[in-house]
A protein has these predicted regions:
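C-terminal subregions of glycosyltransferases and related glycan-biosynthesis enzymes
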Residues: 194-197, 201, 207-330
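Nucleotide-sugar donor-binding/catalytic module of glycosyltransferases
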Residues: 1-233
Length: 330
């Protein structure tokens, strides 16, 4: 008798076959008949199809869906979940890998039928996954459970929203996902955050504190457009959630996009923040006078000096992955 699929590992990808191969390989030894992998390919032109089909000949629980056009990360993940058979779906990144033991743990938690959402902690690694930068992305000493009462959900929002900007940590009830407005968040690149926080969750949230994901840093495809994501999309999204007050939202991100001075300095240091972009954001957000003035000054600072300053700052903060990224633009 065929067992019901409990967990679908959903991966949206585009032209990153070499990393996708590593990601899928990390799951293969842990797969059983209660788990499937769904790969949604946003019109890749590399050998993604061949690689996934080779895996599927070894294990028929690996499924491949090719899209005629790239819909963007939000839409492509949504398509993956719509085609998934599992009770829960893990929105896994195509360039990271999982560690042994996580799938058995997730199955155990899913079968308890207590949770709407499970978050998996991660380690931070370099591009080649051979040097660890940080032991845990989410600094929890032990597993946590957030209940369904309002204060618990507010605590979850304040404690975990920053980490939730990483889509690969999310394991979510598929019925919950499909019941919520998703199209609203297409183009934000944070659809999962919108789905989770647009309303309070009906069941508890479980945080796995042990890091079972290895995140490959300095490999994001969206570096050039990241300034729009972090300066415009992210604050707009966080401040759109009606169930959380201003104090809670401010703990995540300031409402005024141009008041993110450290982030603006970073983007100036890599040459993405300039007077033209400043004007675009100013026209969209109407910042206060001091915020407008300070952010404008940042937009015209010497890029090389900003880069040097921020590399020193990253060294003080012990963030070597940031230094590596900055060196590319020095």
């Amino acid at each position: 008798m065929t067992k019901e699929i409990q967990l679908s590992i959903c991966i949206a990808t585009h032209n990153r076959s070499i990393f996708l191969k590593e990601a899928i390989s990390s799951f293969i030894p842990q797969l059983n008949d209660e788990i499937e992998i769904i790969v949604v390919d946003g019109a890749s032109t590399d050998d993604t199809k061949l690689i996934v089909e080779n895996f599927s000949t070894i294990n028929n629980s690996i499924k491949y869906l090719y899209l005629n056009e790239k819909g963007g990360i939000d839409k492509d993940y949504d398509i993956a979940l719509q085609n998934a058979n599992g009770k829960f779906c893990w929105l896994f990144s195509d360039d990271d890998i999982c560690k042994p033991g996580i799938l058995d743990l997730l199955l155990k938690l899913i079968k308890q039928d207590l949770y709407s959402l499970i978050l998996v902690n991660a380690e931070l690694y370099n591009f080649n996954l051979d040097t660890k930068f940080k032991n845990t992305a989410l600094n929890f000493d032990s597993d946590r459970v957030y209940d369904i009462d309002k204060q618990s959900q507010v605590n979850f929002f304040e404690d975990c929203t920053d980490y939730l900007s990483f889509i690969g940590c999310v394991v979510i009830d598929k019925k919950l996902w499909l019941s919520r407005n998703r199209e609203k968040y297409y183009g934000t690149e944070f659809i999962h955050v919108g789905v989770i926080f647009q309303e309070f969750l009906p069941k508890k949230v479980y945080i796995i504190s042990n890091p079972f994901i290895r995140i490959r840093l300095n490999n994001a495809q969206w570096v050039k457009r990241s300034i729009s994501l972090w300066i415009l999309n992210w604050p707009k999204l966080v401040w759109s959630f009606l169930n959380f007050n201003s104090n809670s939202k401010t703990k995540i991100i300031a409402k005024e996009s141009l008041s993110q001075y450290r982030r603006l300095l970073y983007f100036r240091a890599i040459g993405l923040f300039n007077a033209k972009f400043h004007k675009e954001v100013k026209d969209l957000t109407n910042p206060s006078f001091p915020v407008n003035l300070i952010s404008y000054i940042i937009s015209i600072l010497n890029i090389k000096l900003c880069n040097l300053f921020y590399r020193f700052y990253a060294k003080i903060l012990n963030k070597p992955w940031m230094s590596i990224e900055l060196k590319k633009y020095s």
